[in-house]
């Protein structure tokens, strides 16, 4: 077994001091007071002075980083992402496809399924997030209109063992049969790239127990006092769990705070929506066959349309706390536990508890920068 001593430990509800985190490859074995810690049973003891121990982050919406993209026709792309993500505190993720030609989406989902069976090291792939191609042309964002198609569950059915989330525009559906098929298959419906009215969403989503909202505020009908739109529905429907890109580019700090006040600690999931340019230098990049220009923390198409982000999860957690006043346990839960709960994996992932996977991140207590990442009890990144 191994142990982390002298760190603060973030649990679901509080931050512990004077405790030791004991773990091995099979999971977290103990969270015990320093006075009761038996050091002789541990082969490695890490001094966590100046660090905060948090559960590994789970990123449910990420297109790429480190120069690669989920849509790349490259069998090594996912392995590269899995290897680099621990640098950002991510220990599990959903590779996210985008609105592309159907053969390319099929190939990407096939690669994801194969990788899930073969993966050995790095961040865990928990399944796929399909962002499109069943979206609205009005709010397509950085996705190509020519690749948008009508929703057809037969396109997803061969991959129901892989797809965990599908982003779509509900107003483009002729009826609720597609949504019912997703519910039956255990696939989370996420409203995004949608021009739906508040009333149309209420009609279409009536049969769902819960749903997600893809990057709240972005690429969807906005909140107006007479036309609440997707944003109004998301903020007022208790079933809705909302993704937020907290890079202060996609969302004004006040918009982040509004979401936090409306949705509470359980209704927000922090994401990055990052593209291949994340963890690379400023300059020209690519997304979905389109040129992207990156400067500092902003990624845009030539016409100024935001094109994903270059945000990391650790930075998103820091900004979310600063902008909303959320506590450290609340911000950490938004980047870990809330995702695990939605995916039905909170018995294994999402919080530091005895019996759960030893997916642990040590953050600098002053800057929240990632200093060490542990996956299944093995250190995979150390700054």
Which residues does each PLM region occupy?
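Active-site core of metal-dependent hydrolases
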Residues: 159-280, 380
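N-terminal metal-binding scaffold of metallo-dependent hydrolase/deaminase domains
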Residues: 1-39, 374, 378
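Divalent metal-dependent hydrolysis catalytic cores, especially in the metallo-beta-lactamase
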Residues: 63, 79-108, 123-136, 160-171, ...
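C-terminal cap of metal-dependent C-N hydrolases
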Residues: 7, 341, 351-383
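Alpha-helical scaffold segments that flank or form the walls of functional sites
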Residues: 51-53, 60, 70-123, 146-159, ...
């Amino acid at each position: 077994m191994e142990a982390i001593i002298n760190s603060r430990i973030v649990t679901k509800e509080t931050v512990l001091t004077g405790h030791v985190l004991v773990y091995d490859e099979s999971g977290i074995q103990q969270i015990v007071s320093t006075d009761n810690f038996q050091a002789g049973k541990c082969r490695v003891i890490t001094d966590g002075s100046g660090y905060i121990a948090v559960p590994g982050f789970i990123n449910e919406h990420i297109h790429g980083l480190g120069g690669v993209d989920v849509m790349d026709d490259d069998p090594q792309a996912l392995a590269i992402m899995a290897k680099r993500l621990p640098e950002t505190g991510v220990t599990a993720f959903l590779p996210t496809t985008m609105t592309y030609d159907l053969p390319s989406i099929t190939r990407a989902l096939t690669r994801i399924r194969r990788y899930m069976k073969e993966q050995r090291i790095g961040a865990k792939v928990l399944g796929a997030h399909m962002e499109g191609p069943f979206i609205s042309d009005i709010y397509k964002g950085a996705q190509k209109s020519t690749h948008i198609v009508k929703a057809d569950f037969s396109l997803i059915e061969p991959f129901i063992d892989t797809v965990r989330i599908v982003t779509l525009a509900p107003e483009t559906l002729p009826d609720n049969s597609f949504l019912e098929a997703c519910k039956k298959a255990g696939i989370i419906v996420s409203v995004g790239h949608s021009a739906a009215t508040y009333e149309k969403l209420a009609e279409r989503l009536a049969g769902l127990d819960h749903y997600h909202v893809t990057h709240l505020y972005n690429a969807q009908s906005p909140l107006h006092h007479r036309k609440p739109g997707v944003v109004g529905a998301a903020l007022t429907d208790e079933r809705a769990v909302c993704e937020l890109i907290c890079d202060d580019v996609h969302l004004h700090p006040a918009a982040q705070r509004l979401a936090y006040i409306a949705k509470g600690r359980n209704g927000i999931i922090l994401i990055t929506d990052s593209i291949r340019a994340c963890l690379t230098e400023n300059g020209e990049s690519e997304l979905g066959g389109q040129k992207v220009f990156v400067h500092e923390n902003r990624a845009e198409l030539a016409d100024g349309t935001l094109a994903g982000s270059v945000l990391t999860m650790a930075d998103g957690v820091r900004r979310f706390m600063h902008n909303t006043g959320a506590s450290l346990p609340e911000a950490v839960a938004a980047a870990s536990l809330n995702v695990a709960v939605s995916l039905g994996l909170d018995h294994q992932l999402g919080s530091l508890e005895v019996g759960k996977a030893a997916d642990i991140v040590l953050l600098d207590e002053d800057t929240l920068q990632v200093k060490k990442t542990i996956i299944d009890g093995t250190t995979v990144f150390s700054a």
